[in-house]
Amino acid sequence: MAKRGKKYVEAAKLVERATAYSATEAVELVKKTNTAKFDATVEAAFRLGVDPKKADQQIRGAVVLPHGTGKVQRVLVFAKGEKAKEAEAAGADFVGDADYINKIQQGWFDFDVVVATPDMMGEVGKLGRVLGPKGLMPNPKTGTVTFDVTKAVNEIKAGKVEYRVDKAGNIHVPIGKVSFEDAKLVENFKTIADTLLKAKPAAAKGTYMKNVTVTSTMGPGVRVDVSTLV
């Protein structure tokens, strides 16, 4: 296990590991225990009672956080003709087709989110091996394969985040920055919790939201009382 720095150790002493704090208390603690000198990201982690190996217990989607994440997302849109013009008008950072496919194949990745119109997916599909492992492949479930490119770009720029359960049943989602007001972090936190509760698979048995923690980039994790999120 990696050795923790002195600042981290001191910060961790402020957190009672056996205690599940209210969402508001947890956010306050995360800000108090942040040791980074930069505006650290605040991330929520949900351990869910699902079996991701089963197709009917996969959880994946996207949600627009009311106060965004504090990160400016660079959006690449694969589209042609009028749809390309709409994407540019909506504020997409990069818009094109074959030219950007070639750039990516040559190692260009100066973007954070990829959107594609359905008619472009035949070409974009060639990038599956490159974009897939990075979590950048457009997908209808997250609203990134669509003809409504204006809505897609607007939502991403407004603070849309994608979520996907991993092999261990966990979901990690950024909910803002330590510079955010407490109330805004809590509202973002509750928004993603509510979204995940609504996404509960019918086949999931037992306790669904088993454990929730919140942490800053370089700070200790803080357990959260699930009942304060709903």
Swiss-Prot record:
The cross-references to InterPro entries, in alphabetical order and at most eight, read: Ribosom_uL1_bac-type, Ribosomal_uL1, Ribosomal_uL1-like, Ribosomal_uL1/biogenesis, Ribosomal_uL1_3-a/b-sand, Ribosomal_uL1_CS
Any Pfam family from its record, for instance, is: Ribosomal_L1
Q: Name one GO molecular function term.
A: tRNA binding
Q: What are the recorded Gene Ontology BP terms?
A: regulation of translation; translation
Membrane spanning residue stretches = none
Instruction: Tell me a GO cellular component.
Output: large ribosomal subunit
Q: Which CDD domains match?
A: Ribosomal_L1
Q: What does this protein do?
A: Binds directly to 23S rRNA. The L1 stalk is quite mobile in the ribosome, and is involved in E site tRNA release.
Q: Which HAMAP family does the record match to this protein? A: Ribosomal_uL1_B
Family, as annotated: Belongs to the universal ribosomal protein uL1 family.
Subunit architecture: Part of the 50S ribosomal subunit.
| Record's protein name | Large ribosomal subunit protein uL1
From which organism does this entry originate? Bacillus cytotoxicus (strain DSM 22905 / CIP 110041 / 391-98 / NVH 391-98)
